[in-house]
């Protein structure tokens, strides 16, 4: 059996009360947390570690969702939340509202900073014709759809 990487994703980006009343807080309009804050990570994971072999959702409420994926080249534990109460106290103490950690084979990567202009740059590239094709995006969209609608 080939070696499988161990990958963990913990992504918490606290949202204010507005979130509950906006289209982003409505799963029917936004696709839910897996789509809203997770799509880019699931896309990256599939690109790096291959196709989904197993998909388990272990927890879901209005502000948090978590699960486990078996991909061709990695076992992935993931946790997504927009709940301020889920932030580590050390992050709250610094008056920060985001905690983004990836761990690959016990090596931790903190990417809590650096997201400021990411969407703007992405949209600019799309307008230049440098977007992705439907065929390239289908696996990620199918995965987040399954995650959002999977029975626990």
Predicted regions span which residues?
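C-terminal helix-rich "cap/oligomerization" subdomain common to oxidoreductases
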Residues: 124-152
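Conserved C-terminal active-site "lid" loop/helix of NAD(P)H-dependent oxidoreductases
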Residues: 118-124
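Electropositive phosphate-/nucleotide-binding environments in soluble metabolic enzymes
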Residues: 35, 39, 116, 131
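Predominantly a Rossmann-like dinucleotide-binding segment in NAD(P)-dependent oxidoreductases
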Residues: 1-53
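C-terminal substrate-binding/catalytic lobe of Rossmann-fold NAD(P)-dependent oxidoreductases
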Residues: 62-117
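A general structural signal for well-ordered alpha-helical segments in protein cores
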Residues: 41-42, 119, 144
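Short Pro/Gly-enriched beta-strand edge/turn motifs at strand-loop
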Residues: 47-55, 80-86
